[in-house]
Amino acid sequence: MTRRVVITGVGVRAPGGSGTKEFWDLLTAGRTATRPISFFDASPFRSRIAGEIDFDAVAEGFSPREVRRMDRATQFAVACTRDALADSGLDTGALDPSRIGVALGSAVASATSLENEYLVMSDSGREWLVDPAHLSPMMFDYLSPGVMPAEVAWAAGAEGPVTMVSDGCTSGLDSVGYAVQGTREGSADVVVAGAADTPVSPIVVACFDAIKATTPRNDDPAHASRPFDGTRNGFVLAEGAAMFVLEEYEAAQRRGAHIYAEVGGYATRSQAYHMTGLKKDGREMAESIRAALDEARLDRTAVDYVNAHGSGTKQNDRHETAAFKRSLGEHAYAVPVSSIKSMGGHSLGAIGSIEIAASVLAIEHNVVPPTANLHTPDPECDLDYVPLTAREQRVDTVLTVGSGFGGFQSAMVLHRPEEAA
């Protein structure tokens, strides 16, 4: 019999919301946390706004040695891991460490630290300084994405399977999906899974400027992210992280754990079509949705809330709307759909995990977060996108989806354990 997998611990760092309470308060208030970039002089760029996080590593309990050793994204992942473990009440010291695994996602990993090291080594780009004295001894840690899950494993006391997932904006959803698959198959009893990204740096901002994917609405940062709105013109870049404790359902029950949700189904597909473009018909995302529902043994009408990718680009939101109609049929018009990127921006590889956190909290509190800044509906996005105001309703089952550059399309079904077939 396939083992059931549940989420028993959550840790979040998101713009405007560090910790599950602050994060959920932000979402349910429909409050935005996007602002002018403060990390560097962004005046030369087309898009000069972001979802930044006020994060003090020392105040978060990191030692000076850890601060030196860990990149900012890694610090986010470890901070969320500590929170998730504390939230779960799981005593990892009492477990066989070889049965504890880690799955971590990130789209750009330590790109910001690599950029900083380049500036040091090149005298801000003027001259290449080959003297190793100019190079940080932490350079290898920044260069190797595998260091991020290694640090999480260290924090969790995990000596089981450790996986790094980097497939763009679906990384955070896929890392949890792969963790669930491994736990079901018996390769681990507990997996700490999630994602972290800190892409607010000149090189990453410039990358998205070059393809005009980010919004130039710099005069109105708080209202710049407008998923599904007819006036949307790109996403707002953000940083963030979310980590979860996943464990086998019966083990969680035996120890009296608080269960946020069961991961009923997960699926991913690739369009194999274009690096940044999307097919208009949404076929591959629709296939992921149907496969995730099939794995969860749930009919499409069981979905109470769809946590959309909703990036705020013209093509994504129309593509996604088509996918929902294709996979959910008439139920697509009845179920509430919203995008939390409207409030905190798009944290690339981390956003899938952050959206899982929002999904399990929606189940926990029976509230659907709104889509902020949705004032002018797009005729091609004609579903119920929960504009402006959160909605109280029974939420037993959530479908959360992700779409990433490269054509990756992923879907996950989360539900109350008692709703399992």
UniProtKB/Swiss-Prot annotation:
<keyword id="KW-0012">Acyltransferase</keyword>
<keyword id="KW-0045">Antibiotic biosynthesis</keyword>
<comment type="similarity">
    <text>Belongs to the thiolase-like superfamily. Beta-ketoacyl-ACP synthases family.</text>
</comment>
<dbReference type="InterPro" id="IPR014031">
    <property type="entry name" value="Ketoacyl_synth_C"/>
</dbReference>
<comment type="pathway">
    <text>Antibiotic biosynthesis; granaticin biosynthesis.</text>
</comment>
<dbReference type="InterPro" id="IPR016039">
    <property type="entry name" value="Thiolase-like"/>
</dbReference>
<dbReference type="InterPro" id="IPR020841">
    <property type="entry name" value="PKS_Beta-ketoAc_synthase_dom"/>
</dbReference>
<dbReference type="GO" id="GO:0017000">
    <property type="term" value="P:antibiotic biosynthetic process"/>
</dbReference>
<dbReference type="GO" id="GO:0005829">
    <property type="term" value="C:cytosol"/>
</dbReference>
<protein>
    <recommendedName>
        <fullName>Granaticin polyketide putative beta-ketoacyl synthase 1</fullName>
        <ecNumber>2.3.1.-</ecNumber>
    </recommendedName>
</protein>
<feature type="domain" description="Ketosynthase family 3 (KS3)">
    <location>
        <begin position="2"/>
        <end position="416"/>
    </location>
</feature>
<dbReference type="Pfam" id="PF02801">
    <property type="entry name" value="Ketoacyl-synt_C"/>
</dbReference>
<keyword id="KW-0808">Transferase</keyword>
<dbReference type="InterPro" id="IPR018201">
    <property type="entry name" value="Ketoacyl_synth_AS"/>
</dbReference>
<feature type="active site" description="For beta-ketoacyl synthase activity">
    <location>
        <position position="309"/>
    </location>
</feature>
<feature type="active site" description="For beta-ketoacyl synthase activity">
    <location>
        <position position="346"/>
    </location>
</feature>
<feature type="active site" description="For beta-ketoacyl synthase activity">
    <location>
        <position position="169"/>
    </location>
</feature>
<dbReference type="Pfam" id="PF00109">
    <property type="entry name" value="ketoacyl-synt"/>
</dbReference>
<dbReference type="InterPro" id="IPR000794">
    <property type="entry name" value="Beta-ketoacyl_synthase"/>
</dbReference>
<dbReference type="GO" id="GO:0004315">
    <property type="term" value="F:3-oxoacyl-[acyl-carrier-protein] synthase activity"/>
</dbReference>
<dbReference type="GO" id="GO:0006633">
    <property type="term" value="P:fatty acid biosynthetic process"/>
</dbReference>
<dbReference type="InterPro" id="IPR014030">
    <property type="entry name" value="Ketoacyl_synth_N"/>
</dbReference>
